[in-house]
Amino acid sequence: MLTAEEKAAVTGFWGKVNVDVVGAEALGRLLVVYPWTQRFFEHFGDLSSAGAVMGNPKVKAHGKRVLDAFSEGLKHLDDLKGAFAELSELHCNKLHVDPENFRLLGNVLVVVLARNFGGEFTPLVQADFQKVVAGVANALAHRYH
């Protein structure tokens, strides 16, 4: 559970995030750093190298879509399970995504935020975001239990 101060820090910081850029980089990095996650995206075309993944327009578009959903979830920090219920159902029952991938993506997102915002992404802001991405990963994994 986040305090009111932590919620304000996360939502305030998120307003600075370009979801197109950060989403593309986060999903691309996930697919490069954890190549076994590529099996869910084989229909995206060329994922044969880091350069191919990072430049792939389908990866970029889906990364934006992922962060659009994350952005929507930030509006419901007190009910992440409710906010992500439909996506949890989809990823569990239809797509059969390993729920560990949600945790991996959350951690990659934190890395990308740190890379893009440098000193502005302070240890305290990181701590707040780590709580949020853990909560989102838990919410997305909810239908698996």
Curated annotation (Swiss-Prot):
Keywords: Acetylation, Heme, Iron, Metal-binding, Oxygen transport, Phosphoprotein, S-nitrosylation, Transport. The modification S-nitrosocysteine is found at C92. Pfam families: Globin (PF00042). Residues 1-145 form the Globin domain. Gene3D superfamilies: Globins. The modification N6-acetyllysine is found at K58, K81. One of its GO terms (cellular component) is haptoglobin-hemoglobin complex. Signal peptide: none annotated. One of its GO terms (biological process) is hydrogen peroxide catabolic process. Heme b binds at H62, H91. InterPro entries: Globin (IPR000971), Globin-like_sf (IPR009050), Globin/Proto (IPR012292), Hemoglobin_b (IPR002337), Hemoglobin_oxygen_transport (IPR050056). It comes from the Eukaryota. The modification Phosphothreonine is found at T11. GO terms for molecular function: haptoglobin binding; heme binding; hemoglobin alpha binding; metal ion binding; organic acid binding; oxygen binding; oxygen carrier activity; peroxidase activity. Red blood cells. Heterotetramer of two alpha chains and two beta chains. Belongs to the globin family. Involved in oxygen transport from the lung to the various peripheral tissues. This is Hemoglobin subunit beta-3.
